[in-house]
Regions:
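N-terminal Rossmann-fold NAD(P) dinucleotide-binding loop
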Residues: 2-3
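NAD(P)-binding Rossmann-fold cofactor-contacting core
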Residues: 8-31
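Hydrophobic beta-strand scaffold residues
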Residues: 17, 32, 69-70, 93-95
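Short amphipathic alpha-helix with an adjacent loop that forms part of the alpha/beta core around
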Residues: 33-42
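Alpha-helix C-terminal capping/helix-to-coil transition sites in glycosyltransferase folds
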Residues: 41-42, 46, 90
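N-terminal Rossmann-like NAD(P) cofactor-binding module of classical short-chain dehydrogenase/reductase
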Residues: 46-47, 71
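Rossmann-fold NAD(P)-binding glycine/threonine-rich loop
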Residues: 53-65, 72-114
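Short, structured loop/turn "capping" segments at alpha-beta junctions
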Residues: 116-119
């Protein structure tokens, strides 16, 4: 999903990706840092499509730098969801579920099936 965000941003002159956080650098046209603590560039927002294990350092970085966050990662447990809610009182957070086309297609089909099949 990060690749999709990067390619979409590259096609829009009003948007730029200034950095990424990943263990692997696939030769992106922007710096890739191995942790949030290594980031040395300024960003206007964070778009998170990572893994629940990255939540804590990402939120700490966002609060420390007063950066709004879009969170579109799935698999959070109840304590992590509560952490997101608590952090949203400090910085703007948009928290949604997986935004991939596949999962949204499945969700739409499930809604249609529920209407047709009923209870």
């Amino acid at each position: 999903m990060g690749g999709f965000v990067a390619s979409t941003a590259a096609a829009d002159s009003d948007i730029s990706v200034v950095a990424g956080v990943d263990k692997i650098n696939n030769g992106e046209k922007f710096p890739i840092f191995s942790s949030f603590g290594d980031i040395n560039v300024k960003a206007d927002m964070i778009i998170d499509f990572s893994h629940p294990s990255m939540l804590e350092p990402m939120l700490e970085y966002a609060v420390k730098n007063n950066i709004p966050v879009v969170i579109a990662t799935t698999g959070y447990d109840n304590s992590q969801t509560e952490k997101i809610r608590a952090t949203a009182k400090k910085i703007p957070i948009f928290f949604t579920f997986n935004m991939s086309l596949g999962i949204n297609l499945v969700a739409a089909l499930a809604k249609k099936a529920a209407k047709v099949l009923g209870d």
